[in-house]
Amino acid sequence: MVNRVKRRVSCFPKATYYKPREIPLCCLETANLSIEEIEAIRLCDLLQMEQNEAADRMGISRKTFWSDLQRARQKVADALVNGKAIEISGGEYVNTGECRIHFLCKECDHVWEAKFDQSRPTSCPNCGSNLIFRLGGDGKGKRFIENDYCCPKEKESSRSTDEGSKKKR
């Protein structure tokens, strides 16, 4: 058995789940990207680093980096072309400590960031409120639709149940 080298990751994605609009989650296939695969895409495609530099930054060989990058790109292309959801999770990586997490204060709408390895803030640095939430990470962004998890048949049956209970009143 070959020991897989843990990749160094310096940034976590702000959101970990993407899906096509108006298709219930239960009706979708999911493409799974690991944290290190998304890091390879970030370094090469977003930051436009050369392959050598990106591989060095992740602590792996150029060949390994290229394999990770190609695998990640193939998964993203498959999801986009074939209407699949994309989930980003798991993998074998080491956090380099450069990762930052964003927080939101529900009281004053102030957004700030903290290093990943720091303890969670207890209050907003702007207004002192303790109504703070971590942004990203759970896949539920501002446009999250709560009822999007059920299939169309379930929606219809729940609607008819609701309508039936309204008529009885």
Swiss-Prot record:
Belongs to the UPF0251 family. It comes from Methanosarcina mazei (strain ATCC BAA-159 / DSM 3647 / Goe1 / Go1 / JCM 11833 / OCM 88) (Methanosarcina frisia). This is UPF0251 protein MM_2090. InterPro entries: RNA_pol_sigma_r3/r4-like, UPF0251, WH-like_DNA-bd_sf. Gene3D superfamilies: Winged helix-like DNA-binding domain superfamily/Winged helix DNA-binding domain. It comes from the Archaea.
